[in-house]
Design a protein with these regions (language model features):
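Beta-propeller domains
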Residues: 27-44, 72-91
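Extracytoplasmic beta-rich repeat domains
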Residues: 42-61, 89-110, 133-150, 173-195
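Structural signature of WD-repeat beta-propellers
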Residues: 71-72, 102, 111, 118-119, ...
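Short loop/turn segments that connect beta-strands within beta-propeller blades
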Residues: 80-83, 127-131, 167-171, 212-213
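Short coil/turn segments that connect the beta-strands within blades of beta-propeller domains
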Residues: 16-17, 64-65, 111-112, 151-152, ...
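Blade/loop signatures of beta-propeller domains
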Residues: 1-42
Length: 213
């Protein structure tokens, strides 16, 4: 093929000590990450998983020695990344009529806070060391993807192609935009990518939209 003779040049591989957001970081471009040799399982832990009515789609994240994950009941749990011991667990408060839709969402973390979303449409901020709830907002819903953290904001995308920017300190909405309405959709949305003053949202229509922040 035309590319057969093109050399692939990679920068030196680097060891990462965190994977604090889905995709590694806000830009979803962690670089050339080194994979250790002789990989082996060192611990396992369990959270409430999928069933015929609820799909577990959220991936865990790792920050400052803790692993965070949200399960299909919208419960956020922190484990010790070294040995799997549970540090704390906190279920996001949801009204009874919304509990059937609480699955979905995801988590992202900083050194001090964990931000979680759920399928009902809630965005919550919890203390990284204790799990204490700082704030919980519902800008829209449902939210089937993880949040992205950048520029002091939490960026989330809804199942119906809307993107919201919420302030990390108190959850107040800073702006929102709506993408094209698609005739059909899929379960889950990709977390927005943020870098160099731009947030990029991928919509279910297949379109990408870039917003300056």
């Amino acid at each position: 093929t035309a590319l057969a003779g093109v050399a692939v040049i990679l920068p030196p591989a680097t060891v990462n000590d965190a994977w604090a957001q889905p995709g590694g970081n806000a830009s979803k471009s962690p670089g050339h990450v080194e994979l250790g040799q002789g990989l082996a399982r060192i611990w396992t832990a369990s959270v409430t998983g999928a069933n015929p009515r609820a799909r577990l789609a959220a991936s865990p994240v790792v920050s400052d020695g803790r692993l965070y994950v949200v399960d299909t009941t919208a419960r956020v749990t922190a484990f010790d990344a070294n040995n799997g011991a549970q540090i704390w667990s906190n279920a996001l408060e949801i009204e009874d009529d919304g509990k059937a839709s609480r699955f979905g969402g995801g988590v992202s973390a900083t050194s001090t806070m964990v931000f979680a979303t759920n399928g009902v449409g809630d965005v919550a901020a919890l203390a990284a060391d204790t799990g204490a709830l700082s704030w919980q907002k519902r800008p829209a819903g449902p939210l089937r993807g993880a949040p992205t953290l950048s520029n002091g904001n939490v960026y989330v995308m809804t199942q119906d192609n809307q993107i919201y920017a919420l302030r990390q300190t108190d959850g107040e909405a800073q702006w929102n935009e709506a993408g094209p309405v698609a005739a059909s959709g899929i379960f889950g949305v990709g977390a927005p990518a943020a870098a160099q003053g731009t947030v990029i949202a991928g919509y279910s229509s297949g379109e990408l939209a870039a917003y300056r922040y």
